Amino acid sequence: MSWNQYPGGGHHQQGGYGYRPPPPQWAQQGPPPPPNMGYRPPPPPQAYYNNPPPPQQYQRPAPQQNGYQQGGYQQQQQSQGNYRTSNGGYVPPTGAPVEASYHHTGAGYTPPSGTPQRTSAPYGAGAPIRPPSQAQHYGPQLQGQGGQSAQPYFQYSQCTGKKKALCIGINYVGSSSALAGCINDAHNVQKFLIERYGYKSEDIVMLTDDARNPRQIPTRANILAAMHWLVQGAQPNDSLFFHYSGHGGQTPDLDGDEDDGYDEVIYPLDFKTAGHIVDDDITDCKGRHNIMVRPLPAGCRLTAIYDSCHSGTALDLPYIYSTEGVIKEPNLLAEAGQGLLSAGMSYLRGDTGGMLQGIMGIGKKVMNQNSGAMEKARQTKTSPADVISWSGCKDSQTSADTQEAGRATGAMSYAFIAALTKYPQQSYVQLLNTIRDELKGKYDQKPQLSASHPMDTNILFIC
């Protein structure tokens, strides 16, 4: 079956990605936290659950019409054993779409209701404005083959085009490291996108380990296929949304592109047999898989939420922002030798001035001696697309699986929805602060904001 027949079909699965996380954080910092309070990397499960039972206290919702088709979907009888494909996707089981409400089948939480007291958050000055529509140029002129020069650029998405979403929730039912709130998170985010941002249920793919359709079980193959579906056919001003709630961890970095020596990983339901999924697999910054970031055109938005442990740089984006809206970790400095002469160097502050002069000199020498340096620059982690990632914690932290309003949930998923429910019109820096406020005093984790380009964090968050 070709890739066009099934997104990700025939997709090469990487070897060598066995379960090899470093010692858990609590090993050096005292006793482990209480059960279900952190999304730590799970130990190998006792068995792989092809057809897992519903988790306790979770009632299976009505079958949902979630397909991988580009322009809608067709209905198929659930009893059929073969899943025909059309336009690059499978056909989901039949059933009425879920109702557009936050609270589903008694399993999810109910975010704050009623009219918010104010539309914008108390951080920053005034109401945020929408992002500009024209291309944004930044950094120095780069010289390529034939003496031609060009300046790096990106384009904000207006989010007025096609809207597609992929929501993944894995409770690891029956395993020794089962979680309670991840399936709820996926359904609650789905409902939030439908109600607040105009997404359609037929354009949202759900992968949960209680699904009836085997193509909607969050195995490694299904997750990678769904990622392909999400970005397939992306156009400027489209809005794509990726949400993952489940176990996350770290594995030793083999090529030196991580400052802390570890790549970030997420754990599919079948990670023991199929392996985990590394951040580099998702971004294709090493040429391994062309999935989530590299295929996107300028002006296309991808919003990602990682509600998992060690997720600070889970999407491997180079610009990480502080609660003051400034770059706090200039990861691009490590990429100068690859031909990227500092996308957004003018945004870096503090004591990096002298260091930048040296890097610019090295970069200029590389550009003069290597005619392929421009291509190398295009293969780094920056992108002309508008890619934003919200993660539940720093790379060194765990992310809580907890309860809010008496319902099982991931702390980050809950905080994201609650913050935007209270204050629908927020800038990026405002939203980062209000998300942290939702968790302050209850959890140690610090949610992170990262981007594929230097951004104005005072513009309006849209998706």
Swiss-Prot record:
Its EC number is 3.4.22.-. Residues 20-56 have a biased composition (Pro residues). It comes from the Eukaryota. Residues 57-83 have a biased composition (Low complexity). Residues 1-149 are annotated as: Disordered. GO terms for biological process: apoptotic process; proteolysis. Residues 7-18 have a biased composition (Gly residues). The active site is at residues 247, 309. One of its GO terms (cellular component) is cytoplasm. Keywords: Apoptosis, Hydrolase, Protease, Thiol protease, Zymogen. Pfam families: Peptidase_C14. GO terms for molecular function: cysteine-type endopeptidase activity. Belongs to the peptidase C14B family. Involved in cell death (apoptosis). PANTHER family: METACASPASE-1, METACASPASE-4. This is Metacaspase-1. The gene is MCA1.
